[in-house]
Amino acid sequence: MKKTVRNFIFGVGLVCMAVAFDSCSKKMAEVKYEYTGKPEYAEFANQVKGVLKVGIECAYAPFNWTQPTKEIPGHPELTAEPIFGSADYTYGYDVIFSKMIADEMGLKLEIHKNDWASIWMGLKAGDYDLVESGSIYSAERDTFLDYIDPYYNRFNVIVVKKGSPYEKYTRLEQFKGLKFTTQINTNWPAYIAQVPDPVVLPFPDTCTEVIMKVAMGDVDCGVMDWPTAYSGCLSNPNVVICQIEKGYDFVTPEGASDVCTPSVIEGNTVAVDALKKAMTAIGWNQESMDKYMKLAIETQPLSN
């Protein structure tokens, strides 16, 4: 009987110790984050617990790309950022911009890689705080996004295979009846529609694939923004950008935009206010856009 009582008491003791240990562990895990940066960013910093999480493709040079090391060839003063949950790194225009914003706010930067087709799902799921990747306003996105200030102003171009007769075309009307494609889930199909009677082929997931299809002759023409087209031509010399005359080129469709703007989930006014203040604080303007896009193009690996 005494042995049974002792065993019972011993068992109860073990349970109590386990509960106490679990409680202690939880308290240690729940150590409150304390922000020590600039007061104007404190509310947002506490919201994100000191980590600015940014969603980008890491496959959209020169805005962003994936590389195996943190080194930037020819620029020892620069380093690529690690991709969350991966052994790879990323760099490009988005990373330059994000790092400047994170540093201004006194936050750690964390880059999350996601395919363009599902990048908004990651934002909705709370995997990251904002999306960049050259994203722009659209009526559909406006139903679930709030926008920060412009971080790049783009214009759009046509790429064709080098040596093709289309290389010398200077007016949209000359591309009549040709085979076109562009990246999926963008507003570029509205630009293709400005060409007379285009043959629109299926849209691939990335601009890199568009460049490849043009280079291989699977399509006659691809439509994308100038930096991405220029970057693609550096990587693939079999593709060139057509020089379209002003007044005979693309116009921004009604209700569309060519202003690239980082965006957060709708209703997150704390994030919008803080990010706007940070962009103002770092003096982001057209000169910044030109300077850092030039740097991104210069540092892009030719394999991207």
What are these language model-derived features?
Residues 2-10:
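Bacterial N-terminal signal peptides that target proteins for export
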Residues 19-23:
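C-terminal motif of bacterial Sec signal peptides marking the signal peptidase cleavage site
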Residues 152-160, 234-279, 297-304:
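Periplasmic-binding protein-like
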Residues 27-34, 187-205, 241-243, 274-304:
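Ligand-binding clefts/hinges and TM-proximal coupling segments of bilobed small-molecule sensing domains
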Residues 31-134:
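Extracytoplasmic small-molecule ligand-binding "clamshell" domains
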Residues 58-61, 86-104, 135, 157-211, ...:
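Bilobed "Venus flytrap"/periplasmic-binding protein-like clamshell domains
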Residues 118, 134-144, 191-194, 215-216, ...:
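A ligand-binding cleft/hinge motif common to bilobed small-molecule-binding domains
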Residues 95, 99, 103, 108-174, ...:
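Acidic, polar ligand-binding/catalytic clefts
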